[in-house]
Amino acid sequence: MRKIIGIAAATVVVAGLAGCSSAADESAAPANCTPVLGAADLAEEGTLTIATNATLPPMQYVDADGEVIGMRVDLGKEIAERLCLRPKFVNIEFEAQIPGVQSGRWDMIDTGMFYTPERAETIDLVPYEVQAVSISVPAGNPESISTVDDLAGKTIGVEAPGYEFDTLTALAERFATEGKPALTVQTFKTNADAYQALSAGQIDGTSIVESVTSFYQQDGRFETAVGGINEAPLAMGFAKGSKSAAEVARVLSEMRGDGYLPDLFEQYGVTAYEGDIAVSTGPLDS
């Protein structure tokens, strides 16, 4: 089992569309460090406010003590430290994250968001990681799903909106065109809700990135039936023209060079993005 490192010295905010509540503030910006980002660049002076959807273990999730932990939380904390800022994590569903970063409620989206050219027209993106969509099923694979085409006639759950939902929707449309049995795409507010439905036998499978399906199969209740679907880069997200986007890209490039990022990815079994770590606003060159 991969080692999961919890975060320390970071504020966690649990947020919803109707409001939010804050955990105790136990953190401070690093000493002897001058931030490049000032009050005009941040939602809160001296703080890097980071939106994440903590329902995707081991990438980001809430542990038994109520702490938000995981690879992307570790990464967000390290980014904040290198920017001489205090990290504050806002745990909120993905559908609220892009409007929130656009309106300045938080500075950065760090939730495993897939890079798409359409999304890059809406917010600034910094690619850094690569993932593919997978299908998770109950242990024993009772529906004998082993290929994408085996999803015809099945009901697959997915968090929506998102890249995985778009992938399944496109697949359902292809099946319809080809005259195959319908793929029913059942949407959920969070990935955790989809897994609860899968555990209860309400759906045949659920769709999420490979690192998450691999984690869920560790306790023997689920297994990954299909992987490697629509592999693509993942990115941090920022408001258009945000100074923080350029600074985070700089820090991520620094992490790649000094070994922090490769070591973190190896620990969690994640594939690194091989292109330039830079602010992107349209189709990627690589």
Placement of each model-derived feature along the sequence:
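C-terminal motif of bacterial Sec signal peptides marking the signal peptidase cleavage site
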Residues: 15-19
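Extended ligand-binding regions for polar small-molecule ligands
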Residues: 21, 73-82, 141-142, 149-150, ...
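Ligand-binding cleft/hinge of the Venus flytrap
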Residues: 76-83, 164-187
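Periplasmic-binding protein-like
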Residues: 54, 130-137, 214, 218-253, ...
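Extracytoplasmic small-molecule ligand-binding "clamshell" domains
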Residues: 28-111
